[in-house]
């Protein structure tokens, strides 16, 4: 058959993260990759932190180019929203650069229907039960820990480049 040789200058970060796997799967194993390190070059990079309920998760931090930071932050928070299971309280997922939050989403709380046993039209009783539930959720959020599943750590590496 015919052979094609393509030569590119590309950041090493792009090669390391999933490029080789994608090349093999796209070509069904026929393509090969040969590379050599050319030079160091300065770039405008920032550290993208992931906060879950206000706590930094160092294992999920990324170093990204400043131009792509907002996009990667949004992508990371949306992916975590899919992977973190629902809790009894709202879970805030934020992407931050330094102290500045650039993307935010939240996993909604599971809710029990506290009004199921209230029949009739006593609105004040219903409101009291809902307020009591709301206060309990607030207390839970202060002491609650969120377990980050193992798939979340692998998903960070598989974000679309």
Curated annotation (Swiss-Prot):
One of its GO terms (molecular function) is GTP binding. This is Elongation factor 4. Belongs to the GTP-binding elongation factor family. LepA subfamily. GO terms for cellular component: plasma membrane. Required for accurate and efficient protein synthesis under certain stress conditions. May act as a fidelity factor of the translation reaction, by catalyzing a one-codon backward translocation of tRNAs on improperly translocated ribosomes. Back-translocation proceeds from a post-translocation (POST) complex to a pre-translocation (PRE) complex, thus giving elongation factor G a second chance to translocate the tRNAs correctly. Binds to ribosomes in a GTP-dependent manner. InterPro entries: EF-4, EFG_III/V, EFG_V-like, LepA_C_sf, LepA_CTD. One of its GO terms (biological process) is positive regulation of translation. It holds the Pfam family EFG_C.
